């Protein structure tokens, strides 16, 4: 199952982050609000079953983010070292910007949630921020794709990354 693979990768990332004293953060991108709510409920049920954690513990770890989400105010505290959030389920196009500095896995839930250069740039931008106090080699971000559309998304990601490489930076 897809969620099992995503959870396994999340736990692998957790082990790698232990020396840095960081919690892993995975973002799941959905196409719209209805899809976000639906995926969030199914994912929370999956986590509860797989981890044996209580509903309250799962609610502490999972944020659901869209324009009318009750979790939106909690987003501001995700960079706080005491935050228990490890999963963010979000619509692909948010009106408001947000910056989280410990995203290590990005999961497009469906191809349409991730099929334009703008969306990919926006979402990758969330994952390519280096956590505060990070020392050592550059952290990795995993983009988890479905085999059926991985090549299409890989092509768009490479286009975005090539574009990003050509932007000059000045002191």
What are these regions (language model features)?
Residues 87-112:
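Conserved helicase core region in the C-terminal RecA-like lobe
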Residues 1-25, 31-86, 102, 112-171:
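Helicase-associated low-complexity regulatory tails and linkers flanking the ATPase motor
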């Amino acid at each position: 199952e897809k969620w099992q693979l995503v959870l396994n990768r999340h736990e692998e990332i957790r082990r790698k982050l232990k020396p840095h004293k960081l919690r892993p953060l995975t973002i799941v991108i959905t196409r719209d609000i209805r899809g976000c709510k639906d995926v969030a409920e199914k994912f929370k049920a999956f986590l509860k079953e797989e981890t044996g954690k209580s509903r309250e513990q799962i609610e502490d770890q999972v944020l659901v983010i869209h324009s009318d989400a009750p979790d939106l105010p909690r987003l501001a505290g995700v960079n706080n070292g005491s935050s228990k959030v490890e999963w963010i389920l979000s619509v692909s196009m948010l009106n408001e910007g947000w910056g989280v500095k410990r995203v290590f896995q990005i999961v497009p839930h469906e191809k349409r949630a991730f099929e334009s250069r703008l969306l990919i740039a926006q979402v990758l931008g969330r994952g390519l921020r280096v956590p505060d106090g990070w020392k050592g080699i550059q952290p990795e971000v995993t983009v988890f794709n479905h085999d059926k559309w991985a090549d299409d998304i890989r092509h768009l990601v490479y286009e975005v990354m090539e574009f990003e490489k050509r932007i000059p930076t000045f002191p």
